[in-house]
Amino acid sequence: MDTILNRILTHKRVEVERQRIKIPDAQIRARAEAAPPPRDFAAALRAHRPIALIAEVKKASPSKGVLIENFDPLALAHTYASNGASAISVLTDVRFFQGSLKHLEGIRAMVDRGAVPPLPLLRKDFIIDPYQVAEARAYGADALLLIVAALDDETLAALLALTHSFGMQALVEVHNEDELRRALDAGASIIGVNNRDLHSFTTTLETTRRLAALLPSSNRPLLVSESGIFTAEHVALVRSWGADAILVGEALVTAPDISSKVRELGGGS
């Protein structure tokens, strides 16, 4: 089936091989192993109650095109960190989201020199290859996104284990009951429920309600609600369903006053 996700993954395989030629596996792994210790992504989410905000540095999307003109990833991250975000998600997909690893690297440098609070950084991309895991750590990620719909069980388990071996954590993204079961079977401790169907790109917050009810009560993973969250009412809704955190991009970058929107969605004043 020719879906948006399948088109993205087809291109991603080519992109990874091109990147591997530029910076070979051994070199990117050495850079990853030499990177400063990662910050604790899960702890940052748990520390912020009643709900944590993962604020996303996002220029564009496949469905809506460019979302913010005069895009400045460092200024955006600074605004997020200064207004109460718990973590920062950085889109690094070039072709479909107009992101870049350079954005991640630049934001990490800004955090490390103390220009903003020391928030953990999440690499948001379509990660399908071990190379990208090492690459995430090399460029400063503390955590990364693994999309269950893009991976078979063996690859999901291998990428999750490799992520942990670098000291990073994984936000394991699901959209339906089968994907949630697969994520739990793989040992995911942070589950991201994407309210957007990556095949059709339609969105409903009901996805969070439906899947939150299926989480185990013992050793319950952290639950992050992703996509379709635009108002404080939306935040209250997903929180009432058991979300520990929200991941928001579009609502922030399209807001007339980004600082105020961060405080609104993050529960600040």
Swiss-Prot record:
It comes from the Bacteria. The keyword NADP does not apply. Pfam families: IGPS (PF00218). Pathway: Amino-acid biosynthesis; L-tryptophan biosynthesis; L-tryptophan from chorismate: step 4/5. It catalyses: 1-(2-carboxyphenylamino)-1-deoxy-D-ribulose 5-phosphate + H(+) = (1S,2R)-1-C-(indol-3-yl)glycerol 3-phosphate + CO2 + H2O. GO terms for biological process: L-tryptophan biosynthetic process. InterPro entries: Aldolase_TIM (IPR013785), Indole-3-glycerol_P_synth (IPR045186), Indole-3-glycerol_P_synth_dom (IPR013798), Indole-3-GlycerolPSynthase_CS (IPR001468), RibuloseP-bd_barrel (IPR011060). Its EC number is 4.1.1.48. Keywords: Amino-acid biosynthesis, Aromatic amino acid biosynthesis, Decarboxylase, Lyase, Tryptophan biosynthesis. One of its GO terms (molecular function) is indole-3-glycerol-phosphate synthase activity. NCBIfam families: PRK00278.2-4 (NF001377). This is Indole-3-glycerol phosphate synthase. It comes from Roseiflexus sp. (strain RS-1).
